[in-house]
């Protein structure tokens, strides 16, 4: 089935301009959404705890800042843009008591809805607008008159017009300038988690560390191993980002291209693919979500232990020393 894409002509900005919006959170995505909504003529306020260090920044940016509860009470569209592990308690304590029939609850990621951490009441629209880029890029592109592609989904259309509202919101942050891709909360959440775990954050990191360790154990200098297995990764990824894997292979030497074709499949074997399928299954059946929630409910002991161990890896120490020589990284 062909992807369903929507653009500026498919969205009516007047719809979101007629709503009262609360953006909960002012991190990477929160600041981009709030500022772009404001610049699109939307009545927006930012919901942050009194103790939040981001309050001063949001106020400096000219936004009205209130507590999350006050924001939820004032608004009829609430966009939650705080870390996933905060959603459950934030929703129960600050947002749910102020939801009314006809309100809309929006998300930048589908985790809490997909795994039942939040169960919105009847009569409330539930939708997602998720830019496929970091907040600073979303904001920069908006200011330049362009946009970053967004994923848009509607989980519950209580009003009968939730889809139009979601597209209007996407237009207000520049998403429909580039294109809004229709998806579902299930698809966005499961593919996002799998991509992070098996490829982007987990898979690539472990591949780099394994390559580095293989060279060092064979007697090569750690500094040279770092250059070959980590530092040059950016060069390769940038080529893929610009033109896909084919452009990367077109750009590297024939030697590198042949080596990639013939040796790459020996690294990513059928056994590796089977583990990928297991990881996906754990995402799909809720095993991972249950593990994550339990870990954070306990105060993140294993998470913090692994973070500390990661920071002590030899590759991190070598990288710190080598990056100090790279003047272009200091700007």
Swiss-Prot record:
GO cellular component, one term: cytosol
Cofactor details (free text): Binds 2 magnesium ions per subunit.
InterPro entries to which the protein is assigned, alphabetical: 6-PGluconate_DH-like_C_sf (IPR008927), KARI (IPR013023), KARI_C (IPR000506), KARI_N (IPR013116), KARI_prok (IPR014359), NAD(P)-bd_dom_sf (IPR036291)
Binding, Mg(2+) 1: 192, 196
Residues annotated as domain KARI N-terminal Rossmann: 3-183
Taxonomy, superkingdom: Bacteria
Homology family: Belongs to the ketol-acid reductoisomerase family.
Protein name: Ketol-acid reductoisomerase (NADP(+))
Organism of provenance: Thermobifida fusca (strain YX)
Gene from which the chain derives: ilvC
